[in-house]
Amino acid sequence: MSRSAAASGGPRRPDQHLPPAPCGASGPPETFRTESDGAGTMNKLRQSLRRRKPAYVPEASRPHQWQADEDAVRKGTCSFPVRYLGHVEVEESRGMHVCEDAVKKLKAMGRKSVKSVLWVSADGLRVVDDKTKDLLVDQTIEKVSFCAPDRNLDKAFSYICRDGTTRRWICHCFLALKDSGERLSHAVGCAFAACLERKQRREKECGVTAAFDASRTSFAREGSFRLSGGGRPAEREAGDKKKAEAAAAPAVAPGPAQPGHVSPTPATTSPGEKGEAGTPVAAGTTAAAIPRRHAPLEQLVRQGSFRGFPALSQKNSPFKRQLSLRLNELPSTLQRRTDFQVKGTVPEMEPPGTGDSDGISALCTQISSSFASAGAPVPGPPSATTGTSAWGEPSVPAATAFQPGHKRTPSEAERWLEEVSQVAKAQQQQQQQQQQQQQQQQQQQQQQQQQATSVPPMPTMAPTLQPFSTPVGPFDTAAAQVAVFLPPTHMQPPFVPAYPGLGYPPMPRVPVVGITPSQMVANAFCSAAQLQPQPATLLGKAGAFPPPTAPSAPGGQARPRPNGAPWPPEPAPAPAPELDPFEAQWAALEGKPAVEKPSNPFSGDLQKTFEIEL
């Protein structure tokens, strides 16, 4: 059977596997018919579920939809959702082929487009990022030279503009999301027309005329584009009409009741005038234009233009380098000076003046003690240690006379030098009198020291006096007496006896090893007026040539060393007769300080230790 079927030839049909059809039946079997009917119904159902695309109508055949765009452009509310492809430099300023090539170039770059919104107005074109709301492009309409849709891509639109900084031709390309490129190009054309109308209206209102010559190579312009009245033409027209009505109002309304009737006239007419003349101008003035987006707060802080701390700009800051690099003109220095002048009124009063002088005297004693501890002898402390009252009395008028009479100096050194110069001038006048008194006091001291014996505090000082055994004798009692009076306040006794020049007014003839800067300045001022013999002072630099005073030292502490045993028992009967010469000497010193006490506590008696020749 199979062989006969194979021999019968022909491919096997599907109906061969089916049971034989009844006699007289023709056509395909029933099952085949049902399958074909099911497939047809499914295709019909699938087609019914699909959304059919509307029939395409070209943009040129529906210009009625663009009329709303023109009004929106004039009002500044026209916008289109687009994808910003980017910008590329082009060689020509116009041409559809130039824009098409730019679109192809940007699409070939594969750069990701930015979903944004294109705002079209009479002012210009703005592209705002739809997600971050950043201003991507802000193009003035005057700089746009050409715009056109793409003939190859229905959604593409491009415009060519002049770059403001590099002066190159740049083409910006877009892909519209909902509209066509032709509609975007039409909106930009409306912006061109609105801008041109505004410019012509401005020229007409301002009265600007341009006269060209025959060759068209030059022109002369008359008038100005600047608005003399209000900032806007409509406001200026309304202001002119208000002025005219105000001028005509007094003539129309002579009585008091008339102004109330006339006054509503400008109020009622001006809004109408503004409404009539302002509706078309509103687009020109961009009253409803989109405000430009400002930088975020973080960017303002980063750029340094943040105004959250106004105190930094109000106060004078020393970090404002744009003011001046001179120290006297720095804001910090000026502020310090003004603060001193405000606070300086308190020391100028009489009661605080003494406290100020006491503070200065304490500072001076501290500085002098630091100099002495460092090994630089200070010649002047004994005159200061003769009594706190004697030192404070002359210093009070000096401080009170200095502060109100002068503006505050920038440094203490200038104040110091000024005081030293005053002292030097005073010393030149008082020098002759001091020399006479010094000679008399020298004779008195020599007589008293011959009669007097050593004082109990002296043995403690003896080890420091060994290098100066010969010259220290004449000044032992004086140093001891000072040490007895004021050792705790000024701490002078430990080092006063160690230097021969710390005694009394005969010091200009006695050499001293060290010198303070103030005395160097004082000596430089008064070196020309010094009448003392210079060789003695110049020899005193070495500190090993004090023998000129040795003959005047018959007794004192210089003799315990050579005589040995006989001298130690003598200090016991000495205290009783010691009081009378000491009191006499102290009285002589108290009568003297009014003449020789200067205002500068550092200078002391200002004896000349050596001369500086320049």
From Swiss-Prot:
Chain intervals with Low complexity compositional bias: 246-260, 371-390
CDD domains listed in its UniProt record: PTB_Numb
GO cellular component: cytoplasm; glutamatergic synapse
UniProt main location, coarse: cytoplasm
GO terms of biological process kind: adherens junction organization; axonogenesis; cytokine-mediated signaling pathway; forebrain development; lateral ventricle development; nervous system development; neuroblast division in subventricular zone; neuroblast proliferation
Modified sites of kind Phosphoserine: S224, S228, S263, S411
Protein name, per record: Numb-like protein
